[in-house]
C-alpha cells in the first residue's frame, strides 16, 4: 500500500502540539487555545477500554478545532472492513476474541459490543463487516481520511518513521510501523516528529 502524504500549511500563530499513543489523559492537561494546532501522530486507538470513545472524541475535536492526525499501526482497521483478505479475516477474528494482551477489548470488539453483534469462534466475517461497516461508517470514514504522513514547511509528522528512498516509493505500513527510527542514524532537512517507539527505549 502506497503511503498517503498530506501537504499542510500550518498557521504562523499558536502552539503546535504533537502527541502520539494517547493512552492517558494528556488532552485534559493541554488547555488548548483557539489558535493552537493539535497533531495526533498516530495510535489514537487500542491498549485500553475506551478506543471507540476516544475515536469519537477526536472526531468531535477535529470538527471544532484545528486538529490533524496521521495513521498509526494501531489505528489501521478500515482495511479489515473495506478491503479484507483471507489473512486479515483470520487476524481480525483472533483479535476480536482476544483480550488485546490484557488491555481489554479493542476498537472492533467495542463496536461489536455496542452494536449487539455476537463475537464467537463461528462468526461470519462477511456479516461482521456488513453490520459493523454500516453501523460505524462515520468512524471508518474518518480513519480512511487520515494520511500516513503530514508534510509541512518546517515539520514532517509520521507515526513510526520515514522509510528509506523517495517519498513516491514509501510504503504506508512502513510509515506506521518503523521501530527505533531515531536509532537508524538518518538526518533530514526538517524536524521529523514521530510516535510509536517509547522514549524509554531510546535511552
Which residues does each PLM region occupy?
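Acidic, histidine-bearing metal-coordination/catalytic regions of metal-dependent phosphoesterases
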Residues: 1-18
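A generic local structural motif
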Residues: 2-6, 27-29, 55-56, 143-145, ...
